[in-house]
C-alpha cells in the first residue's frame, strides 16, 4: 500500500482533521450528526458511505415525509395481492396459478445527459438487476423518455445516444422492449428524463428478499470486477442541479462529444455497462435460486458496496464483517472509499450458508461468473469493514441505510399558479371548416408530439423470447407468462408533465387513469401500480408543493381504484440553473389476463365492416392539450376532469367484452383526442374508416370538440357487426355511455383506404402515414 489508510483507530486519534464532506454532498449538520452517531470523526471510508447513502437519491430525505402517504392510504384489501412492496428492490404481486410478477421503474436522468449511451444503457441494466434480486427472471422492459424540443441543437446528441443505449443493452440481454413514451418539450432541454421499467416473473415460492441473516453465513460478491466508474453517481450526479451554463453545449453527432464543459468533469460518475456480462449473471442467478443456494441477495447499483452491505446488514438480524481487500478490482491502487463508492455495473451480493458456498461457487464457475467470499454475517449488530487487517468502517448499519436525515422542506403553492390557471385555451382560434379541421389534423399528426415513434421503436427488439403478445402500436404491452394456460400480464406507463404543471394533484391522477385505461384496453384487469416521480429541486418550495400534491393525487387515485402502489422512485434536482422541468410523475400499471389469446389489439380491420363505438363522454377540454401546444405553443388553464369510477367501469366492460368476444379492437383516447386515436388504429390495421358526427356536435365548434378534445375516461372500440347489439346492451346495463360513431371501411377495391369525417373532410391513409412517419427520420435520421 502506497498511501496511509484512514482507520477507525486513526480517526479516533485525530478528531480535528479536516474532511471534504461538503464536496461529497453532505451539509454541515449532517456531518455533525455522523460524528455524534460514531462518537468521533468518520474515517474516509465511512464518510464515503454516509455521503452516498444519505444522498437525496438513496435516502429519500426530502420526499420520505410525503411518501408515507402511500402506506397510509393502502388498505388491507389492497395489500392482499402484494407479496413485496415499498422498501424492497421492486414490488411483487400475486398474478394467480402460483405465479407472481415483479415490476419497477427507475430514473437515470442526469447520467443520460452527460453520456447518453452509457447513461441509458446502465439505466436498463440497473433496473433489470433490481428485478433479478427479487428472485425473478426479467422478461421485458419499457421506457419513458423526455427530451428537449425536437429541433433544439442538443436533442439529436442526447436522443441518439439514449435510444442506442437502451436498444444496445436490452437487445443484448434478450429482453423485449414492449412499449413506453417519447415526449419532446423545451423544459427537458438540459435535463432529459430516462425512466426505465423492467418486469419479471417468478413462482411465488421463489421470492427472494434483501437481508443478511444467520451469524456465520458468508457474504459473496459475484459478477464483474470493481472499478472507478460511477463513483459519486448518486451523491453528486443524481442529487444536485445542473448549472445554468450547461445547456446546449457539446457535440451533436453520435459519439461527438460528451456534452457541456462542466458536465465533462462528471464523466467518471457515469457507469459503464456490459450487457453480455449481465446476461450471464441473470442465468447464473436463476440457477442459484433454483438450487436454493441463496439466503438473501442485493444488487449493486447506486452507492455500490456501500448500499449492498449496509442495506443487507440493516435489514437482517445481526451485523456484518467485510474484508475489503478480497473485492476483485479492475483498477490499481483503489482506496477503500473508492471501492465502497464504486458503481461498477453487473455485480450482485449474496448471503450464503457455509455448507452451500462450494455449490454456489460451482454454479458461478459454470457460468464463468467471478465470485469471491468477502465477509460474513455476525451477531455484533454493527457493520465492520477491514482493509488488510485494519478496520476502516465500524458503524451501526441502520444509521447508514435506513436512519438518514429526514427533511420537512417548505411547501408553497407558487405565486404564478393562479395566472397559469387563468390563462386558458378558450381564446385560441379554433378550426371551423372541413378544410381547417383537415389541416389541423395533419399539423398534429406531423408534429414531433404525435408523430410515429417507429424510428425509435424499430431500434428495439420487441418480440425476442417469443412471449410478447402486444407491443407495436399497442396501448399497453402484453406478455405470456405460462405457455400451458395462456396466463399473461399487461403493463403500461404514462405521464403528462403539461397537465401536472397546471394541477399536480389532477395531473398525477390523469397519468394513473391513462396507464390504468391502457392496461384495460388490452383486456387485462389492472391490479397494481409503480411510479417514478421526476421533479425539480426540493429546495424550491414551489417544487415541493408540486411534489406533495402529485403524491397525494396518485395515492388517493390508487386507493379509489382499489389497487396498491407497490414501490417507486423519486428523482429530484431535474433542472438547469433555476429552470425546472415540467413536473413529471411517471405511473406504471400492471394487469392480469387469464388467457392472452383474448387480448384486444389496437388495429382496426380484423373483422370486415366493424362498427366504431366511443365509450365515455366528450367535453370541451383543451387546456394543456397537444392541440394548444402544436397550434399556439400554449400551456395554461385547467386539465381535463378525472372520473376514477368511470375508469373502473370502463375496465370492467372491456374485460368482460374481451372475455366474451364482443370487441375486436380497443384504443385509449388521450393526446390528440378521438381523431388521433382513429388515425393510429387505422394505420395499425392498414384500413380506412368513416366517422359520423353524433348528435350535439354538428354546430359551431362542436365538430372540433368532438374530434380533438382530450377529455379523459374514453376508449374507442371496434365491434363486429354481429355483436353490436349485445355490446351496446351490456354498456347500457352498466351505465357506460356508448356512442356509435362510424364503421371501418376498406375503401373501393383497388383504391386507397381513407379516413373520412362525414360532411367535413377526407384524408388518405398513405398521406397520414407519410406525414406521421417522416417526422423523426427527418429530424434525427
UniProtKB/Swiss-Prot annotation:
Residues given in the record as ATP binding sites? 60, 104, 531, 568
| Gene Ontology annotations of biological process type | 'de novo' IMP biosynthetic process
Record keywords, A-Z: ATP-binding, Cytoplasm, Ligase, Magnesium, Metal-binding, Nucleotide-binding, Purine biosynthesis
Top-level lineage group: Bacteria
InterPro entries, per database record: PRibForGlyAmidine_synth_PurL (IPR010074), PurL_linker (IPR041609), PurM-like_C_dom (IPR010918), PurM-like_C_sf (IPR036676), PurM-like_N (IPR016188), PurM-like_N_sf (IPR036921)
Q: Which residues bind substrate?
A: 107-110, 129, 271, 343-345, 571
> Which spans are transmembrane here?
none
Q: Where does Mg(2+) 1 bind?
A: 106, 569
Q: Pathway involvement?
A: Purine metabolism; IMP biosynthesis via de novo pathway; 5-amino-1-(5-phospho-D-ribosyl)imidazole from N(2)-formyl-N(1)-(5-phospho-D-ribosyl)glycinamide: step 1/2
Intracellular or extracellular location(s):
Cytoplasm
Q: What is its EC number?
A: 6.3.5.3
**Catalytic activities:** N(2)-formyl-N(1)-(5-phospho-beta-D-ribosyl)glycinamide + L-glutamine + ATP + H2O = 2-formamido-N(1)-(5-O-phospho-beta-D-ribosyl)acetamidine + L-glutamate + ADP + phosphate + H(+)
Presence of the UniProt keyword DNA repair in the record: no
Q: Which PANTHER family match?
A: PHOSPHORIBOSYLFORMYLGLYCINAMIDINE SYNTHASE SUBUNIT PURL
**NCBIfam families noted in UniProt:** FGAM_synth_II, PRK01213.1
Q: Which family does it belong to?
A: Belongs to the FGAMS family.
Q: Which HAMAP family match?
A: PurL_2
Q: How does it assemble?
A: Monomer. Part of the FGAM synthase complex composed of 1 PurL, 1 PurQ and 2 PurS subunits.
| Chain's role | Part of the phosphoribosylformylglycinamidine synthase complex involved in the purines biosynthetic pathway. Catalyzes the ATP-dependent conversion of formylglycinamide ribonucleotide (FGAR) and glutamine to yield formylglycinamidine ribonucleotide (FGAM) and glutamate. The FGAM synthase complex is composed of three subunits. PurQ produces an ammonia molecule by converting glutamine to glutamate. PurL transfers the ammonia molecule to FGAR to form FGAM in an ATP-dependent manner.
What's the protein here called?
Phosphoribosylformylglycinamidine synthase subunit PurL
Amino acid at each position: 500500500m502506497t498511501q496511509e489508510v484512514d482507520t477507525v483507530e486513526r480517526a479516533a486519534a485525530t478528531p480535528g482533521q479536516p474532511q471534504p464532506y461538503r464536496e461529497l454532498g453532505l451539509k454541515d449538520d449532517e456531518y455533525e450528526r455522523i460524528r455524534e452517531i460514531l462518537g468521533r470523526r468518520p474515517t474516509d471510508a465511512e464518510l464515503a458511505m454516509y455521503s452516498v447513502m444519505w444522498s437525496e437519491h438513496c435516502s429519500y430525505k426530502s420526499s420520505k415525509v410525503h411518501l408515507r402517504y402511500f402506506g397510509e392510504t393502502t388498505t388491507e384489501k389492497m395489500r392482499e395481492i402484494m407479496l413485496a412492496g415499498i422498501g424492497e428492490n421492486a414490488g411483487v404481486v400475486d398474478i394467480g396459478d402460483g405465479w407472481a410478477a415483479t415490476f419497477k421503474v427507475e430514473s437515470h436522468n442526469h447520467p443520460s445527459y452527460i453520456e447518453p449511451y452509457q447513461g441509458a444503457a446502465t439505466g436498463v441494466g440497473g433496473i433489470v438487476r433490481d428485478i433479478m434480486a427479487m428472485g425473478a427472471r426479467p422478461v421485458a422492459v419499457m421506457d419513458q423518455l423526455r427530451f428537449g424540443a425536437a429541433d433544439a441543437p442538443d436533442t439529436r446528441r442526447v436522443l441518439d445516444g439514449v435510444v442506442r443505449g437502451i436498444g444496445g443493452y436490452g437487445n443484448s440481454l434478450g429482453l423485449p422492449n414492449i412499449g413506453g413514451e417519447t415526449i419532446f418539450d423545451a423544459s427537458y432541454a438540459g435535463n432529459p428524463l430516462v425512466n426505465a421499467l423492467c418486469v419479471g416473473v417468478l413462482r411465488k415460492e421463489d421470492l427472494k428478499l434483501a437481508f443478511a441473516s444467520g451469524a456465520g453465513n458468508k457474504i459473496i460478491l459475484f459478477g464483474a470486477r470493481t472499478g472507478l466508474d460511477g463513483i459519486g453517481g448518486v451523491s453528486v450526479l443524481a442529487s444536485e442541479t445542473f448549472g445554468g451554463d450547461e445547456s446546449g453545449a457539446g457535440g451533436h453527432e453520435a459519439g461527438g462529444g460528451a456534452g457541456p464543459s462542466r458536465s465533462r468533469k462528471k464523466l467518471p460518475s457515469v457507469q459503464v455497462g456490459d450487457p453480455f456480462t449481465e446476461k450471464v449473471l441473470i442465468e447464473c442467478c436463476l440457477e442459484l435460486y433454483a438450487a436454493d443456494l441463496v439466503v438473501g441477495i442485493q444488487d449493486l447499483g447506486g452507492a455500490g458496496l456501500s448500499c449492498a452491505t449496509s442495506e443487507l446488514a440493516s435489514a437482517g438480524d445481526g451485523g456484518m464483517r467485510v474484508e475489503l481487500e478480497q473485492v476483485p478490482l479492475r483498477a490499481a491502487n483503489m482506496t477503500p472509499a473508492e471501492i465502497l463508492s464504486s458503481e461498477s455495473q453487473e455485480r450482485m451480493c449474496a448471503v450464503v450458508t457455509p455448507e452451500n458456498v462450494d455449490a454456489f461457487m460451482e454454479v458461478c464457475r459454470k457460468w464463468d461468473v467471478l465470485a469471491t467470499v468477502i465477509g460474513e454475517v455476525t451477531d455484533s449488530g454493527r457493520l465492520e469493514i477491514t482493509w488488510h487487517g485494519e478496520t476502516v468502517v465500524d458503524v451501526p448499519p441502520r444509521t447508514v441505510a435506513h436512519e438518514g436525515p429526514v427533511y420537512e422542506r417548505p411547501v408553497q403553492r407558487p405565486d404564478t399558479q393562479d395566472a397559469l390557471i387563468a390563462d386558458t385555451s378558450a381564446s385560441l382560434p379554433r378550426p371551423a371548416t372541413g378544410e381547417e379541421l383537415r389541416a389541423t389534423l395533419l399539423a398534429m399528426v406531423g408534429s414531433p408530439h404525435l408523430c410515429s415513434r417507429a424510428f425509435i421503436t424499430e431500434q428495439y427488439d420487441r418480440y425476442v423470447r417469443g412471449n410478447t403478445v402486444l407491443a407495436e402500436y399497442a396501448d399497453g404491452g402484453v406478455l405470456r407468462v405460462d405457455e400451458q394456460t395462456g396466463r399473461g400480464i399487461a403493463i403500461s406507463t404514462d405521464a403528462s408533465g403539461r397537465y401536472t404543471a397546471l394541477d399536480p394533484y389532477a395531473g398525477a391522477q390523469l397519468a394513473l387513469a391513462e396507464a390504468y385505461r391502457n392496461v384495460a384496453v388490452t383486456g387485462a384487469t389492472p391490479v397494481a401500480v409503480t411510479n417514478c416521480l421526476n421533479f425539480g429541486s426540493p429546495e424550491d418550495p414551489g417544487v415541493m408543493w408540486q411534489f406533495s400534491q402529485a403524491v397525494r393525487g396518485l395515492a388517493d387515485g390508487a386507493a379509489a381504484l382499489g389497487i396498491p402502489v407497490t414501490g417507486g422512485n423519486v428523482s429530484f434536482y431535474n433542472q438547469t440553473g433555476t429552470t425546472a422541468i415540467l413536473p413529471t410523475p411517471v405511473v406504471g400499471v400492471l394487469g392480469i389476463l387469464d388467457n392472452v389469446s383474448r387480448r384486444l389489439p389496437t388495429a382496426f380491420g380484423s373483422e370486415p365492416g366493424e362498427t366504431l363505438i366511443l365509450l365515455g363522454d366528450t367535453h370541451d377540454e383543451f387546456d394543456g392539450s397537444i392541440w394548444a401546444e402544436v397550434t399556439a405553443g400554449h400551456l395554461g388553464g385547467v386539465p381535463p376532469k378525472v372520473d376514477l369510477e368511470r375508469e373502473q367501469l370502463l375496465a370492467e366492460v372491456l374485460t368482460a367484452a374481451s372475455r366474451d368476444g364482443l370487441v375486436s379492437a380497443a384504443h385509449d383516447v388521450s393526446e390528440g383526442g378521438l381523431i388521433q386515436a382513429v388515425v393510429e388504429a387505422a394505420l395499425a390495421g392498414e384500413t380506412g374508416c368513416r366517422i359520423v358526427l353524433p348528435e350535439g356536435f354538428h354546430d359551431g365548434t362542436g365538430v372540433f370538440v368532438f374530434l380533438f378534445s382530450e377529455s379523459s375516461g374514453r376508449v374507442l372500440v371496434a365491434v363486429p357487426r354481429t355483436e353490436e347489439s349485445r355490446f351496446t346492451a351490456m354498456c347500457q346495463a352498466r351505465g357506460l355511455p356508448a356512442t356509435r360513431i362510424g364503421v371501418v371501411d376498406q375503401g373501393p377495391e383497388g383504391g386507397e383506404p381513407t379516413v373520412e369525417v362525414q360532411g367535413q373532410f377526407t384524408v388518405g391513409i398513405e398521406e397520414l402515414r407519410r406525414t406521421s412517419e417522416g417526422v423523426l427520420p427527418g429530424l434525427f435520421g
